[in-house]
Amino acid sequence: MALNGKLRGRFNNFYIKELISMYTLSQTSLDKLKGVHPNLVNFMKELIKISPWNFKITAGVRTAEEQNKLYQQGRTVKGIKVTKVDGYKLKSNHQVKYDGLGYAVDIGVLVTEKVIEKVKENGKEVEKEIEKTVYKGSWKDFHYYQDIYNKAKNAGLLEKYGIEWGGNCWKSFKDAPHWQIKGADKVAFK
């Protein structure tokens, strides 16, 4: 069975990364893990090393105000709805629990792509193919997060650290960037 070009490219990239690449979290990502439950921090540090895709931490602990700002998207502020919890009546697992820790992290997949851009060479504007790192965070990018989840599951990291993925832990809402401590919904807030 022959693979179409797009799938073949994705497979080859996945296979090559599997063999030769090991990603690491940036200092910015590590800073965003401050105040997060240690199991989740250790999970993220181990996951990035085996992930088929590079990623960054986009959110760790959030205040009620930060959570509410996200809640307003698609409601009182232009954009799509990204959460069902407002930070006040309903709290997010990103918010501090009774033990002073956040129980959730969001990631953003980073993919290097070839793009055509206009650049100046010798005083002339020309089109040139360049490699650029692109953030993959839309619904059509779900497969990147699914790949990461599958790798974590197959490596036994979910069980090892007691983690669940937002892409499959709720029936009514798929939150692909979201990872949390299993059972976090039952842990009391501060």
Report the location of each language-model feature:
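N-terminal amphipathic/basic-hydrophobic helices that include classical n-h-c signal peptides
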Residues: 1-21
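Active-site acidic/histidine clusters and adjacent loop/turn architecture
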Residues: 14-59
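Extended, low-complexity, intrinsically disordered C-terminal regulatory tails
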Residues: 46-78
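Short loop/turn and capping residues at structural boundaries
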Residues: 59, 81, 167-169
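Short, surface-exposed glycine/acidic/tryptophan-bearing loops
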Residues: 65-108
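Catalytic cores and adjacent binding grooves of peptidoglycan-active enzymes
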Residues: 91-190
